[in-house]
Amino acid sequence: MESTPLQYPLGLKTDSLVKQVSEVLKSLTVTKAVGAFIVLFIIIPKVFDFLRNLFSPVTSIPGPLINKFSPWPLEIATFKGKSHRFARALHRKYGPIVVLAPGMISIGDSKEIKRIIQSEDWVKSEAIYGNFRQDFHRPTLLAFTEKKAYSRRKRMLSSMFGIRYIRSLEPLMKSCVDAGVAHLNKLCDNPSKSTIINLQHFIHGLAIDTIGVTTFGGSFHVVENGSHPLPSRLKAGMKISAVMQLISWIKYIPFLPKRDPYIEKFTFDIVDKRRKEAGAVKHQDLLQHLVDVCDDSPGSEFRTSDVQDESVILLAAGSETTANAELFTVIQLLKHPEKMKKLIAEVDKWYPPSEPDRATECAYSQTGMTYLQACIDETMRLIPGQATGSPREASKQEVLLGYKIPRGTTVFPNTQEAHLDGSIWEQPEKYIPERWLEIYSRNQTSAMPYWPFSAGSRICVGKNFAFQEMHISLTTLLRKFTFEYVPGQDETTVFRIAQQLEADSYKVRVKKRF
């Protein structure tokens, strides 16, 4: 049977179509080619994005019109480290649910937040955490968005964060705090006079050294020496990571390495050293647990690169969040001297000044020193590390506060809004640790809309580690030294992975108590 020539629109045959396309290509100048590229790959996709956003149910949610069609306001705020203030201002103006950007909303209602992060345990947002990875296909525990894969990784690492194991790290934590005490003793050489120190640098150095000795088997000696390349590079990396969560195109910049070369070499070398020491040297730190479960065979879910990435997250996130919580706690106490006086009385009750050489012991005092815990909890209520909450994703069409939420929408369960809800907390913006003593007495801590470590299956695995470190550090420092407030300090915060001071320095006066 005779074949029929393939027909095209407008009756063009194959050879005719090829000829016309060839003529069009010949007529293209560089300017026209660039123009065509812009139209095809920039303008047309933007038009489709605009139309999709125009007809999305998200446009019915309160918020500025520009936020519903452009990510720029949120991206600019994120780049400046002000996304938490950006969201706070929107909630104050528009209410408990607001649009942050196309496909992204923030919810400030405590009941809906609990539903999202705890009762229904929504998955983490792929739009956010998909960009928080050194290797897109191999996320860390923090950045998993698929529940089953996350559960497997969590089971693999769970023994590292149990109470029993965390307690075994107490001597290592104490060694760092002792080094910090020795350093302050040198600075306070005149017992009758106070000395001005950079409290921010000191507490961050102490936290970094603690994570170093418990994770990598050795202190970085930041407190004594003032700095170390690894934590400095990690801090810079955290700023980039915070921006990349929302401004993902940065990762497509040519020749931009996936990992900082210094961090890559440092972590690879230390893992390699551990393997060579296997059996000969016994290590009891967190890194050894990672190395023990590492397997580089084909198909392995936990390779050497995963050990490197998890150890970096432990160091960066662990030191940063704990240090900020400690720092803000001390700042709040310095600004409220009557609270500081009350806490010192509790410290002296458990560790009498007549026993200066007695070691601080968590097993002895952590659960009993309720006012210290109240001071920490009240600080984290007012200044939560995860200010805008851990972003989740609607895996199906949902309804929040009566508004339809399309599948795939990123939802920020806004922690700071719940923590400052005047219908739940009396005088919500005031520092009142005593409110927690009543909550503890009624055994209602878990019932409160209070999520500094998130909740549900994605609750921070390092919670017990952080509380133990803070208890040892703060109790020991308040036993040995008196801290005095220096007026005029910049207390503005920025939000980059964790809420932190914008300034690089926070000065206080310190002197020996005895």
Swiss-Prot record:
Domain of life, source organism: Eukaryota
**Requisite cofactors:** heme
Q: Which UniProt keywords apply?
A: Glycoprotein, Heme, Iron, Membrane, Metal-binding, Monooxygenase, Oxidoreductase, Transmembrane, Transmembrane helix
Glycosylation positions? 225, 443
Q: What does this protein do?
A: Cytochrome P450 monooxygenase; part of the gene cluster that mediates the biosynthesis of the mycotoxin fusarin C. Within the cluster, FUS1, FUS2, FUS8 and FUS9 are sufficient for fusarin production. The roles of the other FUS members are yet undetermined. The fusarin C synthetase FUS1 is responsible for the condensation of one acetyl-coenzyme A (CoA) unit with six malonyl-CoA units and the amide linkage of the arising heptaketide and homoserine, subsequently releasing the first intermediate, prefusarin, as an alcohol with an open ring structure.
Tell me which family the UniProt entry assigns to this protein: Belongs to the cytochrome P450 family.
Q: Under what name is this protein listed?
A: Cytochrome P450 monooxygenase FUS8
Say which species the protein is native to.
Gibberella moniliformis (strain M3125 / FGSC 7600)
Q: Gene for this protein?
A: FUS8
